[in-house]
């Protein structure tokens, strides 16, 4: 009798994806983030579902409903903070996952990489809409400022913004539609993640050396299921420490003040995981230019397969490129810091320099250094 795992049409798919999947034997802990992102997504969908049972998407009651969840619902405070801080963990894992892809040249799998970039955009859109829902000051003004950026689009901009708002300002219609989209998008993310995996399993995983690993593959289970469990435990530990000891550490105090269209907060800023893009947006004095820079700061990831000039795949044996990669990482941390600072000297000039450096490294320096490394290796 054959094993049901290998014959049943449904179980067979799971088997080929998570059990008998041939996996390079030398993949490091940097390859754990895919499974961690899956865990984050499931956590966010489940906690979000329970929050949606008690939340009301009406401008008069939204803020009160969140307070009600925290005060009156059994473990409502836990569900709410798991959801809010779970988003932060999601983005930490996302950025590390993308960073791994850049470092080890995983972007040479075009379809997997491009679906991944689309996934990143979708998750960012979901997180932005979710931030609007508690209807605090930063929710309202964040929604107003970010949606208003679309008015920079020539000719149709203003009409587009009013169409998204459902009126002449961010109001009840906006909140209702954002709640609807925030509810549906995670399921679209889940579907895209499946397509992401589908394309990945067509080619097989990359590995730290960047070499073809067909001759040295081992089954995913039990080796990497056990390895992934370590990452899962560390993620849960970090999330629970954050939720139970300092749940508001990554939030904004302004969001504990109900939304007031007549009172603008002194410093409007998004959640910490968008600050690097926000800093790039602010560093360009022109509105349309800023919006384009904001979009291209993420869209530029799609250019990596085209800009890859090295004869080697990953950066494991390329010390010059490694240096540049870590300068880029430090630059992104600098941009994140600048995004949270007020628009005044010296932060303006630091932000502008960091933005220029970001695009210069990716578009010019990294491809040239890769060519130089080819020369040094007489290739």
UniProtKB/Swiss-Prot annotation:
Please provide one cellular component term from the Gene Ontology annotations of this protein.
Answer: respiratory chain complex III
Q: Which residues bind heme b b566?
A: 97, 196
Q: Which residues form the signal peptide?
A: none
Q: Which PROSITE patterns did the record assign?
A: CYTB_CTER, CYTB_NTER
Please name the GO terms that the record assigns under molecular function. metal ion binding; ubiquinol-cytochrome-c reductase activity
* Key words, A-Z: Electron transport, Heme, Iron, Membrane, Metal-binding, Mitochondrion, Mitochondrion inner membrane, Respiratory chain, Transmembrane, Transmembrane helix, Transport, Ubiquinone
- Gene symbol? MT-CYB
Chain sites annotated for binding heme b b562: 83, 182
Q: In the record's cofactor note, how is the cofactor described as bound? A: Binds 2 heme b groups non-covalently.
Q: Coiled-coil annotation: which residues?
A: none
InterPro entries, per the entry: Cyt_b/b6_C, Cyt_b/b6_C_sf, Cyt_b/b6_N, Cytb/b6-like_sf, Cytochrome_b, Cytochrome_b_C_euk/bac, Cytochrome_b_N_euk/bac, Di-haem_cyt_TM
User: Per the UniProt entry, what is one GO biological process?
Assistant: mitochondrial electron transport, ubiquinol to cytochrome c
List the cofactors: heme b
User: Which species is this UniProt entry from?
Assistant: Petaurista xanthotis
Q: Which residues are listed as membrane-spanning?
A: 33-53, 77-98, 113-133, 178-198, 226-246, 288-308, 320-340, 347-367
Record carries keyword Transmembrane: yes
Q: Can you say what this protein is called?
A: Cytochrome b
Q: How does it sit in the membrane?
A: Multi-pass membrane protein
